[in-house]
């Protein structure tokens, strides 16, 4: 039988499908297809149909009966799918045996054709060569740092034939018969002589444009995208002739299934993909005759030779088990390749069959509870894949790496085009809207800062089917949620929908925040499941429901402490949702991403890790493995250099390369912080590492160095006779964890005894320290200034908060850190002054309400304890056991500088100093009062309470002298009552307030970081989105690292050097939206120099343009010292060295910080690139 193959492809989804009808006996002509990715598959006959779906360079192969199976469930699985996904069985044992027999017969025919080709010098079986690559070279199919598989785990080209059976077997629910069939098919391809494959020829690509009626009325399954969805099609069977393409019969199905299928629609055949090269070369007549003669003796004796010929075509859609060919396509559109070429010449068919029809077959999309790293992470339910809107390929993001769109149209026309895309996104799809927003956001915001909100609302429209169902229905049928949370949405569905609609109508779908905040909410905190994306209001509704359910678990204790005094879960949900949507309380991104879901996903952001064993072998094999596991799962880790073991530089390189490899796949912003001691010889190696190769891991690794007070005393010694000794690692361990007096005595004794050490000048050590700090990734800690409510003899927890590593002590294992921030900007109330003891009026018609601040702090204490209970229940990494010992809270503050601007004050005004100290004192005592009230309502104190200083009625400010503490602003009656209640009832938490910068929470809420000055009026911040590098960037990378002559490189060489990079979006000073457009634009364009131009008569405009580059560092340090008695965790002190400064100023700041009793001298240093820091 002379039949022609048909090739169908979907360029967006990156796969092609080949249908070769064969006779029932499986002895017909053989076809072999090879892919450029290295995959090969053989084609059998009978009821088998082969196909290949290209994903990340991996060929998925399947041969078998496809009556009840779609390509979507059989294609090459993603990285984690190979290990975890299970597919339904699709063929009975009898059908599998029949397919195996057909494949065996096909293999025999291939061997005979190969022998004939060897005897006849070519010819033999027809060959179809198809070279397939993805249009997106980087970003979707495993190119240089794409969104799917890491390149190191992709199969090699020369081993794909061996890897194909494993892939095929994995996609059939561990079926041995199917695995054997796939193995036989791969063997057929391997047996084909490679010399007979002709050269590939390019084919033009022209995608069909569906008619308006078809595009608007095409049925869509639950998980498909409106833009990329096109129904599957199956063509009506007709007689196949050499001049007519072979028809594709419809899949066999039952009568009931046929009744459920909608009316078939016509599909216009698509042109070929330009990246698919196909060529066939028919054998010459002489070769064909010779080949037939060579196999004639075997053909005469074979049963196939005497058997009658099979029917040319069979009726479609029937139940006949003897169909001659069968194909099954997924719900994605499959265009037809009609421009095949033979020997480089196009094939033209004069007579073409009718346009093939379409049959819609619903296929459920895979869903995931959260987009994590896209790799084999520890938690299986954290890495489920989603289909990108670009190509329909499974990955860890909604869009592949962005190819920057270059456009020279004016900003006004560009914004109008974005609005048109947003209004028509249902019909046209979100890809064009996403590309236009991300490519032009920086330019548009700098031109007109007021368009930041418009871009944010347009970006929300990129979510798939966000308004298809009510919000409660979105969650109540989701099996990824905890049963209690899903039951909450079923019980209070109408209440949830009404509250969400009320908030959305009042502040908009982006909740009144800018573009960066919206992108982080949707692509870092939002999840994809059941074919839909979470929007900001959906994320907060899920988190609020999880917190409301958790309140029911503790027996209603939390109801008594919340400021709104709820009586049931619905009212608690309303209180939490209002606080979250107004960004009054800002949880960490991990809480927003995973709260409410089942499984063991960690909802804490960072851990302080100490190895359980200290031998060299267990440390190298265990510690590094554990750290890499936690970093891979998106956790920031703080670890001591002494615990790494082995060569410290080699360990740092290993960890740095791991962080660097994860950057293109990371969902959360993670930092690996290494803390070390300046009295250890490891300090010399780490200093050299930071100064030499530290920039390679910028933003990925950070460092913190412990500097004792004796070190600074020797640095300030005017005689210059005092030297500094750096001891060996084993000797230096004896100095860890000692107080000031003990450390000085032991150090001087080791110095007199002549212990093995390296002697350096203190001045040289400080110069090295300044150079490392100036890099911006090194913090300086004063361990002897750290105070704690826990005596040292019972173990000390992490006291430096989420931003800074552990200073000393701590417990073996993982100590989790929850970061929870309150927004002071929500406490500024508009209106006339109110004469009250809880309000402070500072002008411009606004007042800062301490009553509102009290409500925020009490709600934050309750919310923090609920998060601790969630962590204890899941106990990820065993962190719950350590967390129960002290139940440390890490309540941070954001928006202080924004409050000063709204009140018409500058950062360094005298009123600002007073308000700074009063806010810090009020927050601490209010948090202690709320924690005590929890115990009075029925909760238990933390287990170590009897051995803490709280049991004696002491608080953290009591550890400071009166001169250090300053005047008390809380009443004496309040403090006496609080001490009495603590001694009698206990306290729920051991620590409360942290002085972290909270940059991510501040950017999410659109306010200023911590108690610190604003970074800038407009600055770029990394997002979870990825962008392919431009040609100039790749060329720069080539010249800088590879040292190759640029003029000798081609573009394909450059594409192998660049890697995908995070997209940076602008973060705008929200106060600029409140002033005139002209003044805001001028402030943005002037950049860091804007505050120096005080030419405006409007005080509000002058205050809004103030940034950290113009605020005096002395004012920042003074405020930090004033807050120190009320911040029981360390404060992450930033230092900005402006133009004209030098690193010499750093030493002065460090000396002052040590003398003033700060626990952290410098957390992060910001310096312009022109400053000389060495």
Swiss-Prot record:
Localization (cell): Virion; Host cytoplasm
Chief location: virion
MF (Gene Ontology): ATP binding; ribonucleoside-diphosphate reductase activity, thioredoxin disulfide as acceptor
Chain ranges for the short sequence motif RIP homotypic interaction motif (RHIM) as given in the UniProt record: 50-72
Gene3D superfamilies: 3.20.70.20
UniProt keyword annotations, A-Z: Host cytoplasm, Host-virus interaction, Inhibition of host NF-kappa-B by virus, Late protein, Virion
Record bears the keyword Lipid biosynthesis: no
Coiled-coil ranges per UniProt: none
A Pfam family the protein falls into: RHIM
Database matches in InterPro entries: HSV_RIR1_betahv (IPR034716), RHIM (IPR025735), RNR_lg_C (IPR000788), RNR_lsu_N (IPR013509), Rrm1 (IPR039718)
UniProt region (Disordered), positions on chain: 170-269, 291-325
Post-translational modification, as annotated: Undergoes proteolytic cleavage, generating two peptides, a N-terminal and a 116 kDa. The N-terminal peptide retains RIPK1- and RIPK3-binding activity as well as cell death suppression activity.
Taxonomic superkingdom: Viruses
Gene Ontology cellular component terms for the protein in this record: host cell cytoplasm; virion component
Record site feature (Cleavage), residues: 277-278
Biased composition (Low complexity): 182-202, 233-243, 291-316
Domain description: The N-terminal region drives rapid self-assembly into homo-oligomeric amyloid fibrils and interacts with the RHIMs of host kinases RIPK1 and RIPK3, and ZBP1 to form heteromeric amyloid fibrils.
Database matches in HAMAP family: HSV_RIR1_betahv (MF_04027)
Family per record: Belongs to the ribonucleoside diphosphate reductase large chain family.
Protein name: Ribonucleoside-diphosphate reductase large subunit-like protein
Record organism: Murid herpesvirus 1 (strain Smith) (MuHV-1)
Organism classification: Viruses, Duplodnaviria, Heunggongvirae, Peploviricota, Herviviricetes
């Amino acid at each position: 039988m002379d039949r022609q193959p048909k090739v169908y492809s979907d360029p967006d989804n990156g796969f092609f499908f080949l249908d070769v009808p064969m006779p029932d006996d499986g002895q017909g002509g053989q076809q072999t297809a090879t892919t450029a990715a290295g995959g090969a598959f053989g084609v059998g006959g009978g009821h088998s149909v082969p196909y290949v779906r290209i994903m990340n360079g991996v060929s998925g192969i399947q041969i078998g009966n496809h009556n009840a199976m779609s390509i979507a469930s059989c294609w090459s699985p993603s990285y984690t799918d190979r290990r975890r996904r299970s597919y339904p069985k699709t063929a009975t044992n009898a059908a599998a045996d029949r397919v195996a027999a057909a494949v065996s017969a096909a293999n025999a025919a291939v061997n005979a054709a190969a022998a004939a080709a060897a005897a006849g010098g070519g010819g033999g079986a027809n060959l179809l060569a198809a070279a397939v690559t993805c249009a997106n070279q980087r970003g979707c199919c495993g190119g240089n740092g794409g969104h799917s598989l890491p390149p190191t785990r992709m199969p090699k080209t020369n081993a794909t034939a061996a890897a194909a059976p494993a892939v095929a077997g994995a996609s059939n629910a561990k079926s041995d018969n199917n695995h054997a069939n796939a193995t036989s098919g791969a063997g057929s391809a391997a047996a084909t002589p490679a010399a007979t494959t002709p050269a590939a020829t390019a084919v033009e690509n022209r995608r069909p444009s569906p008619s308006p009626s078809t595009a608007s009325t095409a049925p869509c399954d639950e998980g498909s995208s409106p833009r990329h969805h096109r129904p599957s099609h199956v063509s009506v069977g007709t007689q196949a002739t050499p001049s007519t393409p072979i028809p594709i019969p419809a899949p066999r199905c039952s009568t009931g299934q046929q009744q459920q299928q909608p009316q078939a629609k016509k599909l216009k055949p698509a042109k070929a993909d330009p990246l698919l090269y196909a060529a066939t070369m028919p054998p010459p007549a002489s070769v064909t005759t010779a080949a037939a003669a060579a196999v004639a003796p075997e053909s005469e004796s074979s049963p196939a030779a005497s058997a009658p010929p099979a029917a040319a075509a069979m009726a479609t859609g029937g139940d006949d088990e003897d169909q001659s060919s069968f194909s099954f396509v997924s719900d994605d559109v499959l265009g037809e390749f009609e421009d095949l070429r033979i020997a480089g010449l196009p094939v033209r068919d004069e007579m073409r069959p009718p346009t093939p029809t379409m049959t819609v077959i619903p296929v459920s999309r895979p869903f995931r509870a959260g987009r994590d790293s896209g790799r084999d992470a520890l938690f299986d339910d954290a890495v489920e894949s989603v289909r990108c809107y670009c190509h329909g390929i499974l990955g860890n993001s909604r869009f592949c790496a962005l190819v920057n769109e270059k456009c020279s149209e004016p900003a006004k026309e560009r914004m109008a085009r974005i609005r048109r895309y947003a209004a028509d996104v249902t019909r046209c799809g979100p890809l064009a809207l996403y590309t236009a927003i991300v490519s032009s956001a920086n330019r548009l915001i700098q031109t007109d800062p007021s368009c930041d909100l418009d871009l944010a609302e347009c970006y929300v429209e990129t979510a798939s089917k966000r308004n298809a169902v009510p919000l409660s229905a979105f969650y109540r049928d989701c099996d990824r949620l905890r049963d209690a949370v899903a039951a909450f949405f079923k019980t209070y569905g109408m209440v949830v929908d009404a509250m969400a609609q009320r908030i959305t109508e009042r502040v908009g779908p982006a909740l009144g925040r800018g573009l960066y905040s919206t992108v982080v909410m949707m692509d870092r905190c939002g999840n994809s499941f059941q074919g839909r994306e979470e929007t900001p209001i959906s994320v907060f509704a899920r988190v609020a429901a999880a917190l409301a359910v958790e309140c029911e678990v503790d027996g209603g204790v939390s109801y008594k402490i919340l400021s709104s005094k709820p009586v049931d879960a619905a009212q608690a949900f309303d209180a939490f949702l209002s606080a979250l949507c107004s960004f009054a309380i800002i949880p960490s991104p991990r809480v927003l991403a995973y709260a409410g879901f089942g499984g063991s996903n960690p909802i804490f952001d960072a851990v302080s890790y100490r190895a359980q064993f200290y031998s060299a072998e267990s440390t190298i094999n265990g510690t590094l493995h554990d750290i890499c596991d936690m970093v891979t799962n998106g956790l920031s880790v703080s670890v001591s250099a002494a615990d790494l073991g082995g060569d410290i530089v080699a360990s740092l390189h290993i960890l740095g390369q791991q962080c660097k490899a994860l950057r293109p796949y990371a969902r959360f912003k993670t930092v690996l912080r290494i803390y070390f001691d300046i009295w250890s010889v490891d300090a010399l190696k780490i200093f050299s590492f930071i100064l030499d190769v530290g920039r390679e891991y910028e933003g990925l690794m950070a460092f913190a160095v412990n500097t004792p007070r004796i070190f600074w005393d020797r640095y300030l010694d005017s005689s210059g006779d005092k030297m500094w000794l750096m001891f060996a690692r084993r000797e230096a361990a004896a100095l860890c964890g000692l107080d000031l007096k003990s450390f000085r005595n032991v150090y001087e004794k080791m110095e007199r005894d002549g212990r093995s050490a390296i002697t350096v000048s203190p001045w040289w050590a400080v110069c090295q320290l300044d150079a490392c700090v100036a890099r911006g990734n090194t913090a300086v800690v004063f361990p002897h200034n750290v105070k704690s409510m826990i005596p040292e003899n019972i173990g000390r927890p992490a006291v430096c908060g989420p931003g800074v590593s552990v200073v000393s002590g701590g417990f073996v294992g993982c100590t989790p850190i929850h970061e929870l921030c309150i927004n002071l900007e929500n406490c500024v109330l508009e209106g006339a002054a109110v004469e009250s003891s809880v309000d402070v009026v500072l002008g411009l018609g606004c007042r800062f309400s301490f009553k509102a601040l009290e409500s925020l702090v009490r709600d934050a204490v309750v919310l923090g304890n609920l998060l601790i209970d969630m962590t204890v229940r899941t106990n990820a990494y065993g962190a719950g056991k350590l967390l129960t010992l002290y139940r440390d809270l890490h309540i941070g503050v954001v928006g202080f500088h924004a409050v000063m601007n709204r009140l018409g004050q500058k950062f360094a005004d005298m009123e600002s100093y007073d308000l700074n100290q009063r806010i810090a004192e009020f927050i601490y005592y209010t948090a202690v009062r709320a924690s005590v009230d929890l115990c009075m309502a029925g909760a238990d104190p933390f287990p170590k309470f009897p051995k803490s200083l709280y049991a004696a009625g002491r608080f953290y400010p009591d550890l400071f002298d009166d001169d250090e503490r300053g005047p008390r602003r809380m009443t004496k009656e309040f403090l006496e009552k609080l001490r009495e209640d603590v001694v009698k009832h206990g306290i729920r938490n051991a620590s409360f307030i942290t002085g972290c910068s909270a940059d991510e929470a501040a950017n999410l809420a659109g306010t200023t970081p911590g108690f610190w000055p604003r970074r800038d009026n407009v600055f770029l911040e990394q997002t979870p989105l990825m962008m392919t590098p431009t040609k100039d960037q790749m060329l720069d990378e080539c010249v800088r690292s590879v040292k190759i002559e640029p003029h000798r490189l081609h573009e394909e060489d450059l594409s192998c050097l660049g890697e995908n990079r995070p997209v940076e979006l602008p973060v705008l000073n929200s106060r600029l939206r409140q002033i005139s457009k002209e003044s805001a634009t001028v402030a943005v364009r002037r950049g860091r120099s804007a505050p120096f131009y005080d030419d405006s008569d409007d005080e509000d405009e002058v205050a809004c343009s103030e940034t950290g580059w113009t605020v005096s560092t002395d004012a920042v340090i003074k405020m930090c010292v004033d807050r120190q008695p009320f911040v029981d965790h360390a404060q992450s002190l930033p230092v900005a060295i402006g133009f004209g400064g030098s690193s010499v100023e750093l030493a002065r700041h460090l000396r002052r910080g040590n003398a003033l009793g700060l626990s952290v001298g410098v957390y992060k240093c910001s310096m312009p690139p022109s400053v000389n820091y060495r």
